Design a protein with these regions (language model features):
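Charged, cofactor-coupling segments
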Residues: 24, 32-148
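Gly/Pro-rich turn-and-neighbor structural signature
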Residues: 1-26, 48
Length: 148
């Protein structure tokens, strides 16, 4: 799969609303977190095959000119499925809570709410063991269900 074939997947839901963003969805990340290091990218110009071991940013966003913007960004590692299918998948490397204060839950459907809650469960599970009690209180609150 090449990046230009993946890019429309990230833009799908915005496009359904007549919206888009003017940047690529993702770019290569190299040694010492060197950003915009190719050849891999997920964008309309991404013609490089995505291969196992490549690290790519995943950063869809939306910007309403002179009003606001949002971008949720993680780094992802391309990995091979362990099922002899020769398929690849992305494993999220950078895990941080999405700020729930910035989410308009009334605009989300049940699947979107479930995705955010599942993501936050993963964040908590992966980070909590490295935190002391004060930080753990913050992480627990930040990763709790968005509909409380």
């Amino acid at each position: 799969t090449i990046g230009k074939d993946l890019d429309p997947c990230a833009r799908k839901y915005l496009k359904e609303e007549g919206l888009d963003y003017k940047h690529g969805t993702g770019h290569g990340v190299g040694s010492f977190l060197g950003v915009h290091e190719g050849p891999q990218s997920i964008s309309p110009l991404g013609f490089q095959e995505i291969k196992e071991g490549m690290i790519i940013s995943n950063e869809p966003g939306y910007y309403k000119e002179n009003e606001y913007g949002i971008r949720i960004e993680n780094l992802i590692l391309t990995k091979e499925m362990n099922d002899n299918s020769n398929h690849l998948y992305f494993k999220t490397l950078t895990l941080a809570p999405i700020d729930k204060n910035l989410i308009s839950t009334e605009m989300l459907n049940n699947d979107e709410i479930k995705w955010i809650d599942t993501y936050h469960e993963k964040v908590f599970k992966n980070l909590s063991e490295f935190m002391q009690e004060e930080e753990l209180v913050w992480l627990r609150k930040s990763c709790g269900p968005i509909m409380q």
